[in-house]
Amino acid sequence: MADWYRLAWPLICGLDPERAHHLAIRALALGLAGHDRAADDPVLACSLWGRRFANPLGLAAGFDKNGEVADALFDLGFGFVEVGTVTPRPQAGNPRPRLFRLTQDRAVINRMGFNNQGMEAMAARFVRARPRGVLGINLGKNKTTEDAAGDYEAGIAKLAPLADYLVINVSSPNTPGLRALQGREPLSLLIARARAALDAACPGLRPPLLLKVAPDLTDEDMADIAEVALGGGLDGLICTNTTIARPKSLVSDHAGETGGLSGLPLRYRARQVIARLYGLTKGALPLIGVGGIGDGAEAYARIRAGASLIQIYSALVYEGPGLVGRIKRDLAQRLRADGFASVAEAVGADHRDPKGASGKLAPRSPL
């Protein structure tokens, strides 16, 4: 934990979590969150989808829902930033309280419900000032929309020209019926319409189209998603969103709250999903690993399991912005210790040599 963040932690804990989040956005907007001036180790550099990433560590969607502070987030040292989830129309989300810290478990439960200012506000912001790093935009549907694919088409039409990659989010547990879109038939239809919308919006060089999936998938579900992804024109998968499962190990007061659980308890399951989907796709589809990553050891484990890139979010709540640099330094050391000259060389290494990882992996979670 950065010294200033450690000192501020008692004050942060005393604030309502959503209030603390708004203050964090404000601090970033004012340039008060700091700047990582250290150059990234060259071993961390990645190339994917024709884009260059200075390092593979990104910020997951959900933090900067409206694209207000992307440049300030790049200043913290992230290799890429994913904003959103954004919907075609502004919406308030679910009633408060809807965000809960599980401090003893190093976890968070949220039932935000895609609260955001809408795609027009985000587009206007990025037209005025395009963020200087690799930018992902995470797309969702409005709660009251019956034609879900129509909302994703609208988001693609408006925001595709402004993004380095787009994400179709059908895995949040906080929008009724959304996860049903992960089934083989509805997903195939959705991806076909999204791809057509993307081709129309960017007839030349189009941004990659990714799908964000849930951790609460059966082996059959994952096989279906892999088949659709490979045959339906997706450029990658993000694994995983929050879980509706509640491991018996949770001890925090808010463990029984409704919503999606993120953070440390999700670590093993999210890694397991990455490994499974890497195997099902035979490494042919880039994967972004997210869920329970809070240190360099797990970042490295996720890459060895099959992730080309990784993302964090919940761990920042407990560790602060200094975590970004710590993960990158540790990851670089682990790559070199195992003889890898690049991140790309390590992707999926456990499928080739499951006993070759340096360091000790996190224990298996009961989730």
From Swiss-Prot:
<dbReference type="GO" id="GO:0006207">
    <property type="term" value="P:'de novo' pyrimidine nucleobase biosynthetic process"/>
</dbReference>
<feature type="binding site">
    <location>
        <position position="169"/>
    </location>
    <ligand>
        <name>substrate</name>
    </ligand>
</feature>
<keyword id="KW-0285">Flavoprotein</keyword>
<feature type="binding site">
    <location>
        <position position="292"/>
    </location>
    <ligand>
        <name>FMN</name>
    </ligand>
</feature>
<comment type="function">
    <text>Catalyzes the conversion of dihydroorotate to orotate with quinone as electron acceptor.</text>
</comment>
<keyword id="KW-0665">Pyrimidine biosynthesis</keyword>
<dbReference type="GO" id="GO:0106430">
    <property type="term" value="F:dihydroorotate dehydrogenase (quinone) activity"/>
</dbReference>
<dbReference type="GO" id="GO:0005737">
    <property type="term" value="C:cytoplasm"/>
</dbReference>
<feature type="active site" description="Nucleophile">
    <location>
        <position position="172"/>
    </location>
</feature>
<feature type="binding site">
    <location>
        <position position="65"/>
    </location>
    <ligand>
        <name>substrate</name>
    </ligand>
</feature>
<keyword id="KW-1003">Cell membrane</keyword>
<feature type="binding site">
    <location>
        <position position="212"/>
    </location>
    <ligand>
        <name>FMN</name>
    </ligand>
</feature>
<dbReference type="InterPro" id="IPR050074">
    <property type="entry name" value="DHO_dehydrogenase"/>
</dbReference>
<feature type="binding site">
    <location>
        <position position="174"/>
    </location>
    <ligand>
        <name>substrate</name>
    </ligand>
</feature>
<comment type="similarity">
    <text>Belongs to the dihydroorotate dehydrogenase family. Type 2 subfamily.</text>
</comment>
<keyword id="KW-0288">FMN</keyword>
<keyword id="KW-0560">Oxidoreductase</keyword>
<comment type="pathway">
    <text>Pyrimidine metabolism; UMP biosynthesis via de novo pathway; orotate from (S)-dihydroorotate (quinone route): step 1/1.</text>
</comment>
<feature type="binding site">
    <location>
        <position position="240"/>
    </location>
    <ligand>
        <name>FMN</name>
    </ligand>
</feature>
<dbReference type="InterPro" id="IPR001295">
    <property type="entry name" value="Dihydroorotate_DH_CS"/>
</dbReference>
<feature type="binding site">
    <location>
        <begin position="110"/>
        <end position="114"/>
    </location>
    <ligand>
        <name>substrate</name>
    </ligand>
</feature>
<feature type="binding site">
    <location>
        <begin position="241"/>
        <end position="242"/>
    </location>
    <ligand>
        <name>substrate</name>
    </ligand>
</feature>
<feature type="binding site">
    <location>
        <position position="263"/>
    </location>
    <ligand>
        <name>FMN</name>
    </ligand>
</feature>
<feature type="binding site">
    <location>
        <position position="169"/>
    </location>
    <ligand>
        <name>FMN</name>
    </ligand>
</feature>
<feature type="binding site">
    <location>
        <begin position="61"/>
        <end position="65"/>
    </location>
    <ligand>
        <name>FMN</name>
    </ligand>
</feature>
<dbReference type="GO" id="GO:0005886">
    <property type="term" value="C:plasma membrane"/>
</dbReference>
<comment type="subunit">
    <text>Monomer.</text>
</comment>
<feature type="binding site">
    <location>
        <begin position="313"/>
        <end position="314"/>
    </location>
    <ligand>
        <name>FMN</name>
    </ligand>
</feature>
<dbReference type="InterPro" id="IPR005720">
    <property type="entry name" value="Dihydroorotate_DH_cat"/>
</dbReference>
<keyword id="KW-0472">Membrane</keyword>
<feature type="binding site">
    <location>
        <position position="138"/>
    </location>
    <ligand>
        <name>FMN</name>
    </ligand>
</feature>
<dbReference type="GO" id="GO:0044205">
    <property type="term" value="P:'de novo' UMP biosynthetic process"/>
</dbReference>
<dbReference type="InterPro" id="IPR005719">
    <property type="entry name" value="Dihydroorotate_DH_2"/>
</dbReference>
<dbReference type="InterPro" id="IPR013785">
    <property type="entry name" value="Aldolase_TIM"/>
</dbReference>
<protein>
    <recommendedName>
        <fullName>Dihydroorotate dehydrogenase (quinone)</fullName>
        <ecNumber>1.3.5.2</ecNumber>
    </recommendedName>
</protein>
<feature type="binding site">
    <location>
        <position position="85"/>
    </location>
    <ligand>
        <name>FMN</name>
    </ligand>
</feature>
<dbReference type="Pfam" id="PF01180">
    <property type="entry name" value="DHO_dh"/>
</dbReference>
